[in-house]
């Protein structure tokens, strides 16, 4: 990412002066401190894991018939 696009506070502006997006939508998914697809994947795996623990507990622990 080029440093000339950054504002005085270090953040990227949302739009260029001519109205075009400052960062293309393709780069928004792959650049940054942590890619959004990686955060979403880790979150989805964590949700599936927690649900799996609940289902496992319902069949093996207290509450199983």
Swiss-Prot record:
Region spans: Disordered: 1-21
**Record keyword Cell membrane present:** no
List, alphabetically, the SUPFAM superfamilies matched.
Answer: Photosystem II reaction center protein J, PsbJ
Q: Does the keyword Thylakoid apply?
A: yes
Q: Where in the cell is it found?
A: Cellular thylakoid membrane
- Bias (Basic and acidic residues) ranges: 1-18
List the membrane topology term(s).
Single-pass membrane protein
> What are the GO BP annotations of this UniProt entry?
photosynthesis
Predominantly, its location class is membrane
InterPro entries cross-referenced by the UniProt entry: PSII_PsbJ (IPR002682), PSII_PsbJ_sf (IPR037267)
Q: Which Pfam family, an example, fits this chain?
A: PsbJ
List the GO cellular component terms: photosystem II reaction center; plasma membrane-derived thylakoid membrane
What is its quaternary makeup?
PSII is composed of 1 copy each of membrane proteins PsbA, PsbB, PsbC, PsbD, PsbE, PsbF, PsbH, PsbI, PsbJ, PsbK, PsbL, PsbM, PsbT, PsbX, PsbY, Psb30/Ycf12, peripheral proteins PsbO, CyanoQ (PsbQ), PsbU, PsbV and a large number of cofactors. It forms dimeric complexes.
Q: Its biological function?
A: One of the components of the core complex of photosystem II (PSII). PSII is a light-driven water:plastoquinone oxidoreductase that uses light energy to abstract electrons from H(2)O, generating O(2) and a proton gradient subsequently used for ATP formation. It consists of a core antenna complex that captures photons, and an electron transfer chain that converts photonic excitation into a charge separation.
Family recorded in the similarity comment:
Belongs to the PsbJ family.
What name goes with this protein?
Photosystem II reaction center protein J
